[in-house]
C-alpha cells in the first residue's frame, strides 16, 4: 500500500516537474566552446518559453507521443561538419502546432558536389508522430513560408531523439530524471549562454534573441539604415494592435527596450516618438505582468512545497510506526517469541539497536527537510521585503523634487533586478525541488530497507553507506550551485551598471521632468488643502471640548445632589436595620424550637436509613429461603470477556444490573425493539473473578456437609467459558481455580473445623458422557454401547483428604477427557463431564449419620455445524451433543409446565441429572454468555433456555440424616414382626393344615425360632447390612435412574434387568441393565410436617425396611435377584483405593 502511494506521489511530482521545467535540450551544450560565435549560435538555438508556452508544451507532452522511425539522431560527423553551413530554422513543437506548419525531419548525411545538403526526407502523417517536446526540428526554407533564422558554425550540432547516444554518454529527454552533476552542468550552461550581449548584435534581425519567437513580425519593426534603427510607424501600430507581445519571450522584450534606449541615446534631441513611447510602455506593462504572474507562480510553488513537506512528515511518521509497531502487536509477538524463539533474543536486541539508529537517521532527514524549508521561506521573505522596500522607497523619493532622477533610475534598476531575481528564484526553486525529490527517493529506499531489516542486515549497512555518499554528493551539488549563483550575481551587477548609464541618460529628458514637476505641484496643492481642512477640524475640536466641559460641570452638580439623597437614605436604612434585627431575634427563637424537633425526626430517619440495608439483606435472605422452599433452580449468568484481537465495542450486552438484570441488544433491529431484558438470580460482568463467582455459591456447597444433594452445572454455547468457570485454565494458579477445586477445598476446610463434632469422609468420582456413552475418567475403562442395553462402567471412587489429592485426580480426569479443536474454539470439550463428590458424616455425640452428594457438571457446548466447520468424528460428536442438550431442554420444558411425564430416558445426560432436576436437591445452573455480535442467535437461545429453567420448581430440598431413634424404631419393628410371625405359625399349627404345609411352616418356624433365640445379634447384623447396603447404593453411579433415597425403589424384585448378588460380591463384571424406565417412589410435595406425622412416616419406612431385610435373610430368597440399582455397587479395579 505504501509502495503504491509512493508511486502515485512520484508520478504527481514528475508531472509538476514537467510544468515547472523549461524544455531545453541537454545535449546542445556538450560540444560548444565559449566564443562569441558559439554563444550567439546557442542563443539562437535555445528555446525560451513563457508560461503560456509551457502550458501548451504540457498538453503536447502528456499525450505520450511515440517517436517514429524518422525521429533518429541528426548527426553529422566531425569530418563532414567542418564545411557544412546549415541555414534552417529551429522551432519548438508548440510554435509549430500554433502555425500548422508541415514538419519535415532531416537526417544529415555525407554531402556531395551536386547537392551539398543531401537529406533523407520523411514526412509525418499526423501531429501525433512529432518528436518529443524540446527537440530541435529542421524546417526546409522552401517548404516553410514562415521567416527563418540562419545559424552558422563550423562545429557539428547534435540534436538527439530519446534513446540515442553520442560520445559515450546516454542523452535523455528534458523530462527524464538526471543526476545532480548533469543538472549542475546544465545550470552552468544556462547561466553562461543565456545572458544578454552588451554589443549591438543583440538587435541583429538574424538573431532570435532580439525578436519575438514563434514567427512573430516584431523583427520587421526595425530596419538597419546607416548603422542605426529606423522605427516604422506602420509596423509599430501593427505590433500594438496584435497580441504578439503576450506570446513573446521576456528576453526579446528586454532586447526591444534596450534597442529603444540605444536609439534615443543616438538621437541628438533625446525625444521619443509617441508610438515608440506607447510601445515602450506596453512592453514595460507586459514585463510587470509577467513579474506578477511569476510571483504568483512562486506562491503556488511554495504551497506545493509545503504540501509535499506535510506528506513527507506523514510518511516519516508511518515509517516510525512501522519500525516501532503497535502495542497490541508487540504483546502478541512477545508472547509468541517467548514460547517459540527464545534462542533469538540476542538478535532482536541487535535489531532494536539498528532501529534506534534508523530512527536517528530519520530525525536527521527531518531536520534537513526543515532547514531546506526555512531556507526557502527566508528567500521568499527576502524577495517580499525587497519588493516592499522598493515600493516604499519609490513613494518616499517622489516627494523630493531634487532626487527625482535618482529615484527613477533606482526604480528602473529595481525592476530589472526583480526580473533577474525572479528568474534566479525560479531556478533555485527547481534545484530545491529536485533535491526534495532525491530525498523522497532516498526515503523510499530507506522504507524498503526497514522492511527487509530482519533478513539482510549487512545489505542495509551497505545501502546506508551509499545513502551517506549520495547525501555528500547532494551537499557538494548545492555548494556548486551556490557558487554558480554568486557568479551569476556578479555578472548581473556588471549588466546593471551598463543599464544604469543608459537610464541616467534617459532620465535627462524634458518630458519626464515636466511630468514630475506637475505631479509635485499637484501634491503641494493637496497639502495646502489638507492644511485648511485640518485647521477647520482643530476649531471644531475646540468647540467640542468646551461643550464637554459644560456637560461635566452639570454632571458634577447632579452627582452632589445624588450623594446628599443617598446619605438620607442611609440614615433611614439604619433605622430599618435595627427593627429588622429585633424581628430576626424573635424568628431565631422560633427556629431553634423547630430545628430541635427536626433534629429528633432526622435522628429517627437516620436510624431508619441505617437499618434500610439490613432490611434489604433480610429481604434477600427471605427471598432465597422462599426460593429454597419452592425448590426453584437458581440461575447465575456470567458474561465472558472479549479475547485479544476482538473489538470490545461490538457487544450484544447493553446493561448489567446489580440485582440480576441483563439487557441484550439486537444489532439487526433498530429502536426499542432491539432491546430484550432478562432477570436472573445473579449476573456477573466480564470483569468478575473466579473468587467472586464462588463466594455466591459457598452456602450452596456447604449444605452438602449438612446432608443435602447439590447439583451445579454450566450451560452455554461452545467457547463461552464453561470449562473455565467449572475447572479453570490449564495450569491454573490458586487465584484462577474453578468451582470444582474451590468447592472441594472449602469442604476440606469446613470438615477440619468440625472434626471435633462430626467425622467426615469425602470421595470423588469423575465420569463423562461421550457420544451417549458413560465413561470413567479416573480408571480409564472405556465401555461401548451394546445392542441389547447400556453398558455401565465400574465408576471408581477415590477417597480424598486434601486439596493435593483433588488436583491429582482432576488432572488425570482432564487428560482422559475428549477435547479437540474447532473453528470456534481451540480446545473444545466434546463430552459432558460430571464430577461427583460423596460426603459421609457421623455425629460423634449422637451417633447420627448424614449423606450428601455434590454433582459438578460441565456440559459440552452447543454449536452450529456451519460455524464450527466440523466433519467426520467431530460432526458425529456435535450431533450427539446437540441431541443431549435438546433432550435437556425437553425435560426443563416438561418440568416448567408441570407435565405428568418427564422424558428423562431420552438421553444419558438427563438420566444422570434426574436426581438433581426431579428430586429434592438444590440445583444451580451457570449460564455462560458470549458477548460477540456474531454469536447473537446462540446467546439469545441460551438466555431463553435459562429463563425457562429459572421457573422450574423442584420442591424443598430434604436432608438424608438418620438419627438414633430411627434405628431403635427399626429394631423394635423387626422384633414385633418376628413375634407376629411366630404367633401366625402357631395358629396355622392349631388349625391342622395339611402335612406338607405343616412341615414347611414348621421348618420356617424353626428357622425363625433360631433367629429369635439370637435376636440381638441378628438385629445388629441386619442393621449393619442395611447400613452398608444403603451406603453403597448412595455412593454408586446410576445408569440414568433416579438416586432415590427410599429403600423401596432400591429393592424392586420385579425388574427385568438385574445383577446376581454373588457376582456383585465377587467383583465380576455386571450384566446388562435394561433401558426400560423403572418406577420411582413418588415424593410428597409438602414442605413442612408435624412431629406426629413425621413419626408415622418413620415407622412406615422402618416396616418396609424390615420386610426387605427379612426377605433377603430367609432361606427361600437365597437365589433371589437384586434390582438394577444393586448393580451399581462401587467395584473399582484392584489398584483403586477402597473405603473400609
Curated annotation (Swiss-Prot):
Residues 197-209, 1002-1018, 1099-1130 have a biased composition (Polar residues). ATP binds at residues 716-723. The keyword Nucleotide-binding applies. Residues 1-12, 180-193, 332-347, 1066-1078 have a biased composition (Basic and acidic residues). The keyword Coiled coil applies. GO terms for molecular function: ATP binding; microtubule binding; microtubule motor activity. GO terms for cellular component: microtubule; microtubule cytoskeleton. Residues 327-546 form a coiled coil. It comes from the Eukaryota. Residues 632-952 form the Kinesin motor domain. Keywords: ATP-binding, Coiled coil, Microtubule, Motor protein, Nucleotide-binding. Residues 1-37, 50-81, 161-217, 323-347, 1002-1021, 1028-1140 are annotated as: Disordered. GO terms for biological process: microtubule-based movement; microtubule-based process. Residues 161-179 have a biased composition (Low complexity). Belongs to the TRAFAC class myosin-kinesin ATPase superfamily. Kinesin family. KIN-14 subfamily. This is Kinesin-like protein KIN-14O. It comes from Arabidopsis thaliana (Mouse-ear cress).
Amino acid at each position: 500500500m505504501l509502495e503504491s502511494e509512493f508511486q502515485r506521489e512520484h508520478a504527481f511530482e514528475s508531472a509538476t516537474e514537467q510544468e515547472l521545467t523549461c524544455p531545453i535540450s541537454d545535449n546542445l551544450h556538450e560540444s560548444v566552446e565559449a566564443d562569441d560565435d558559439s554563444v550567439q549560435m546557442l542563443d539562437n538555438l535555445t528555446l525560451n518559453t513563457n508560461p503560456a508556452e509551457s502550458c501548451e508544451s504540457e498538453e503536447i507532452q502528456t499525450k505520450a507521443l511515440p517517436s517514429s522511425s524518422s525521429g533518429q539522431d541528426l548527426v553529422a560527423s566531425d569530418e563532414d561538419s567542418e564545411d557544412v553551413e546549415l541555414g534552417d530554422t529551429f522551432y519548438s513543437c508548440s510554435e509549430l502546432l500554433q502555425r500548422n506548419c508541415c514538419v519535415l525531419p532531416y537526417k544529415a548525411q555525407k554531402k556531395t558536389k551536386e547537392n551539398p545538403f543531401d537529406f533523407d526526407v520523411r514526412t509525418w502523417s499526423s501531429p501525433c508522430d512529432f518528436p518529443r517536446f524540446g527537440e530541435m526540428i529542421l524546417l526546409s526554407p522552401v517548404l516553410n513560408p514562415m521567416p527563418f533564422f540562419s545559424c552558422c558554425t563550423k562545429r557539428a550540432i547534435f540534436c538527439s531523439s530519446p534513446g540515442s547516444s553520442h560520445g559515450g554518454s546516454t542523452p535523455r529527454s528534458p523530462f527524464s530524471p538526471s543526476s545532480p552533476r548533469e543538472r549542475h552542468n546544465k545550470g552552468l550552461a544556462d547561466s553562461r549562454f543565456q545572458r544578454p550581449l552588451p554589443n549591438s548584435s543583440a538587435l541583429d534581425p538574424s538573431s532570435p534573441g532580439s525578436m519575438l519567437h514563434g514567427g512573430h513580425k516584431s523583427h520587421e519593426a526595425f530596419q538597419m539604415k546607416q548603422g542605426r534603427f529606423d522605427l516604422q510607424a506602420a509596423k509599430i501600430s501593427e505590433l500594438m494592435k496584435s497580441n504578439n507581445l503576450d506570446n513573446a519571450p521576456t528576453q526579446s522584450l528586454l532586447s526591444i527596450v534596450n534597442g529603444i534606449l540605444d536609439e534615443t541615446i543616438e538621437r541628438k534631441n533625446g525625444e521619443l516618438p509617441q508610438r515608440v513611447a506607447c510601445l515602450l510602455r506596453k512592453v514595460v506593462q507586459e514585463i510587470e505582468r509577467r513579474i506578477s504572474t511569476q510571483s504568483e507562480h512562486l506562491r503556488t510553488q511554495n504551497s506545493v512545497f509545503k504540501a509535499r513537506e506535510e506528506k513527507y512528515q506523514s510518511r516519516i511518521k508511518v515509517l516510525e510506526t512501522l519500525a516501532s509497531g503497535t502495542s497490541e502487536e508487540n504483546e502478541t509477538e512477545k508472547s509468541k517469541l517467548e514460547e517459540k524463539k527464545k534462542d533469538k533474543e540476542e538478535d532482536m536486541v541487535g535489531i532494536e539497536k539498528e532501529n534506534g539508529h534508523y530512527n536517528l537517521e530519520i530525525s536527521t532527514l527531518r531536520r534537513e527537510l526543515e532547514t531546506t524549508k526555512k531556507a526557502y521561506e527566508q528567500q521568499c521573505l527576502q524577495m517580499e521585503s525587497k519588493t516592499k522596500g522598493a515600493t516604499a522607497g519609490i513613494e518616499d523619493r517622489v516627494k523630493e523634487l531634487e532626487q527625482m532622477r535618482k529615484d527613477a533610475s533606482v526604480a528602473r534598476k529595481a525592476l530589472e533586478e526583480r526580473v533577474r531575481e525572479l528568474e534566479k528564484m525560479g531556478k533555485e526553486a527547481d534545484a530545491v525541488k529536485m533535491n526534495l525529490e532525491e530525498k523522497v527517493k532516498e526515503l523510499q529506499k530507506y522504507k524498503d530497507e526497514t522492511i527487509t531489516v530482519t533478513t539482510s542486515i549487512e545489505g542495509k549497512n551497505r545501502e546506508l553507506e551509499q545513502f551517506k555518499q549520495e547525501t555528500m554528493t547532494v551537499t557538494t551539488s548545492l555548494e556548486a550551485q551556490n557558487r554558480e549563483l554568486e557568479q551569476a550575481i556578479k555578472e548581473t551587477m556588471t549588466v546593471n551598471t551598463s543599464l544604469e548609464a543608459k537610464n541616467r541618460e534617459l532620465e535627462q529628458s524634458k518630458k519626464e521632468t515636466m511630468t514630475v514637476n506637475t505631479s509635485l505641484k499637484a501634491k503641494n496643492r493637496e497639502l495646502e488643502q489638507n492644511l485648511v481642512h485640518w485647521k477647520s477640524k482643530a476649531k471644531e475640536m475646540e468647540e467640542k471640548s468646551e461643550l464637554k466641559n459644560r456637560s461635566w460641570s452639570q454632571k458634577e452638580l447632579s452627582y452632589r445632589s445624588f450623594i446628599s439623597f443617598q446619605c438620607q437614605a442611609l440614615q433611614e436604612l439604619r433605622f430599618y436595620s435595627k427593627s429588622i434585627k429585633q424581628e430576626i431575634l424573635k424568628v431565631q427563637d422560633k427556629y431553634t424550637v423547630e430545628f430541635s424537633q427536626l433534629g429528633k425526626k432526622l435522628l429517627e430517619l437516620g436510624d431508619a436509613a441505617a437499618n434500610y440495608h439490613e432490611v434489604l439483606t433480610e429481604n434477600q435472605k427471605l427471598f432465597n429461603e422462599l426460593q429454597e422452599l419452592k425448590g426453584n433452580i437458581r440461575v447465575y449468568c456470567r458474561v465472558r470477556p472479549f479475547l485479544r484481537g476482538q473489538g470490545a465495542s461490538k457487544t450484544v450486552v447493553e446493561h448489567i444490573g446489580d440485582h440480576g438484570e441483563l439487557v441484550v441488544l439486537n444489532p439487526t433491529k433498530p429502536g426499542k425493539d432491539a432491546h430484550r431484558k432478562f432477570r436472573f438470580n445473579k449476573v456477573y460482568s466480564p470483569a468478575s473473578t473466579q473468587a467472586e463467582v464462588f463466594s455466591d455459591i459457598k452456602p450452596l456447597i456447604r449444605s452438602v456437609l449438612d446432608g443435602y444433594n447439590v447439583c451445579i452445572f454450566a450451560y452455554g454455547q461452545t467457547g463461552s467459558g464453561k470449562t473455565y468457570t467449572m475447572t479453570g485454565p490449564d495450569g491454573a494458579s490458586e487465584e484462577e481455580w474453578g468451582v470444582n477445586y474451590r468447592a472441594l477445598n472449602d469442604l476440606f476446610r469446613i470438615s477440619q473445623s468440625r472434626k471435633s463434632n462430626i467425622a467426615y469422609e469425602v470421595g470423588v468420582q469423575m465420569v463423562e458422557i461421550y457420544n451417549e456413552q458413560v465413561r470413567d475418567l479416573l480408571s480409564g475403562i472405556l465401555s461401548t454401547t451394546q445392542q441389547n442395553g447400556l453398558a455401565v462402567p465400574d465408576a471408581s471412587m477415590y477417597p480424598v483428604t486434601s486439596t493435593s489429592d483433588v488436583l491429582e485426580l482432576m488432572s488425570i480426569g482432564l487428560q482422559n477427557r475428549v477435547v479437540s479443536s474447532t473453528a470456534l474454539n481451540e480446545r473444545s470439550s466434546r463430552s459432558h463431564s460430571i464430577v461427583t463428590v460423596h460426603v459421609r458424616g457421623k455425629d460423634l455425640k449422637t451417633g447420627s449419620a448424614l449423606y450428601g452428594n455434590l454433582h459438578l457438571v460441565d456440559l459440552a457446548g452447543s454449536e452450529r455445524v456451519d460455524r464450527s466447520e466440523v466433519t467426520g468424528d467431530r460432526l458425529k460428536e456435535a450431533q450427539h451433543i446437540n441431541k443431549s442438550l435438546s433432550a435437556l431442554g425437553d425435560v426443563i420444558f416438561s418440568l416448567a409446565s408441570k407435565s405428568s411425564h418427564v422424558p428423562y430416558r431420552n438421553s444419558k445426560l438427563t438420566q444422570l441429572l434426574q436426581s438433581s432436576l426431579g428430586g429434592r436437591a438444590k440445583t444451580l445452573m451457570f449460564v455462560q454468555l458470549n458477548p460477540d455480535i456474531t454469536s447473537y442467535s446462540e446467546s439469545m437461545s441460551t438466555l431463553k433456555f435459562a429463563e425457562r429453567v429459572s421457573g422450574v420448581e423442584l420442591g424443598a430440598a430434604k436432608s438424608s440424616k438418620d438419627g438414633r431413634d430411627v434405628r431403635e424404631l427399626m429394631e423394635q419393628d423387626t422384633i414385633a414382626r418376628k413375634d407376629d410371625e411366630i404367633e401366625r405359625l402357631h395358629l396355622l399349627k392349631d388349625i391342622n393344615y395339611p402335612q406338607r404345609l405343616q412341615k414347611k411352616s414348621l421348618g420356617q418356624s424353626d428357622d425363625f425360632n433360631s433367629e429369635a433365640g439370637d435376636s440381638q445379634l441378628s438385629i445388629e447384623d441386619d442393621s449393619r447390612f442395611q447400613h452398608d447396603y444403603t451406603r453403597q447404593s448412595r455412593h454408586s453411579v446410576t445408569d440414568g435412574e433416579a438416586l432415590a433415597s427410599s429403600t423401596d425403589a432400591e429393592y424392586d424384585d420385579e425388574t427385568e434387568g438385574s445383577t446376581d448378588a454373588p457376582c456383585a460380591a465377587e467383583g465380576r463384571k455386571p450384566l446388562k441393565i435394561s433401558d426400560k424406565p423403572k418406577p420411582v417412589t413418588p415424593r410428597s410435595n409438602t414442605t413442612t410436617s408435624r412431629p406426629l406425622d413425621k413419626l408415622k412416616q418413620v415407622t412406615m419406612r422402618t416396616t418396609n425396611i424390615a420386610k426387605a431385610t427379612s426377605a433377603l435373610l430367609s432361606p427361600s430368597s437365597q437365589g433371589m435377584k437384586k434390582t438394577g440399582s444393586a448393580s451399581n455397587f462401587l467395584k473399582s479395579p484392584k489398584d483403586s483405593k477402597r473405603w473400609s
